[in-house]
Amino acid sequence: MDPSDAHLGHAQFGDTPDSGDAKTSSRVPLPEGTLPVGIGLLIAGVTSYLFLKVAKVALGSDEAVQPIASLWIATFALAPGFFLPLEQELARTLAHRRAIGQGGQPVVARVRTLGIGLAGIVTLAALAASPLIVSGYFDGDWVLMLALILAFSAYAPAHLSRGIASGNGRFRAYAIVMGADGAVRIVLCAALAILGVKTVGLYGFVVALSPLPGVLYVRARGALRTEPGPESTWAEVTPNLGWLLLGSVFAAALVNAGPLAATLLADGSVGQKRLVTRFTYGVLLARIPLFLFQAVQAALLPRLSRLAARNEIAEFRSGFMRLMKLVLLVGVVGTAGAFLLGPLVIEKFYDAELSRKTMAMLALGSALYMVALAIAQAVIALRGHALVALGWGIGAVTFVVVTWLSSDELFRRVELGLVASSITALITFALALRSRLRSGDLPSGQSVMEAINNMPLET
């Protein structure tokens, strides 16, 4: 899966109509939008695995693909971290206005201004640091630096478009924006390969521009239209945005930290570039449990949202424990599967080699991250946004320290950093959850929606 989307939550789980007393039936119908968004998510996930395969066929070797893989990872470490919270808050606010019969045009204008400002600040920071980024990460290639800036900017309208589509219940448009990104990336990459293009920079621009065709298509069809309404205030669209943004930036960086760190720590030789690319293959394969986690959410979170809205806390806790058991099961199966089958899959699909130990460590880190993410969502549901930001921040610091001090072996130090960072984040969230429960904090429908949407991953 891509360096990271998991926005089945944007199908507005909490808005599923109640069809009777919860005690009469434990079954919850699939929320509106689950099917189209699920299809878009599937397309995005499958094409993400195919992208590096097509790029390798086009460029001829693992070491030739490494700059493109590094650009791709960097893009999804930056864009979701900064823009997913805007998408989430825009969708939440528009859905609320739609429910009370108010137009959302002023809300979109507010969030658009915020997005432009955020994109501008991050772009200026990237430009200021560009000499260091180019020399330390892109091996002196300024074209890839330009592609990174363009890619980051291109994902701003993509995320805002998804927020508008989701908040207005236009889930087909949401799925088109999501799925078209991966589909366009594959088609353009394959076209360059057929033409025999070997220039890495052109493949970089494919990564940069792939989000835009889907946005332009749904805009042309009027799916991003909003109605006039009462003036929007900053308080309406940013009640928890600061903490959500901070936590999202740390979480997105952490889920992509493995390939990022491996690229920075490699010595730049052909052999090391080959190893970094193969490591990236392993990271993508190890994320399959995270992809399955989204399916688990789709099945259980609609009921949790309804229970929270009714203040049925005992049932909410029971449902959350069921979710945690499934998450743990997915994590165990994923780790065992990576150990037993991971090297074979890497060999057959990517024509590369990766050890069982490396695959198992990567899958373990991914599984622990998944558990931490599930607990973090529960903390957000209990209005612990600041605690979640703190937990992801502690995880990020742990990754840096452990990767720096633990070993001199490239893969081992990064693997240990990933596992240790997920463990510290998990422990922090578990302590925060216990604290929020003991203090008597109760979830609300809105806080659960924020929790459901809090998936800082992109496929």
Language model: regions and residue ranges:
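Membrane-interface junctions at transmembrane-helix termini in multi-pass inner-membrane proteins
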Residues: 154-176, 358-360, 364-391
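Interhelical loop/hinge segments that connect adjacent transmembrane helices in multipass membrane
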Residues: 4-5, 9, 14-30, 172-176, ...
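Signature of the first transmembrane helix
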Residues: 2-7, 14, 28-87, 127, ...
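Hydrophobic alpha-helical transmembrane segments
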Residues: 142-149, 175-224, 394-398, 411-436
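Membrane-water interface segments that mark the loop-to-transmembrane alpha-helix transition
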Residues: 29-44, 70-71, 80-131, 312-335
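Transmembrane helical elements of multi-pass membrane transporters/channels
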Residues: 32-52, 180-181, 185, 203-218, ...
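Helix-loop junctions and terminal segments of transmembrane helices
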Residues: 83-99, 282-286, 290-311, 381
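Short membrane-interface helical motifs at transmembrane helix boundaries
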Residues: 54-57, 121-139, 333-351
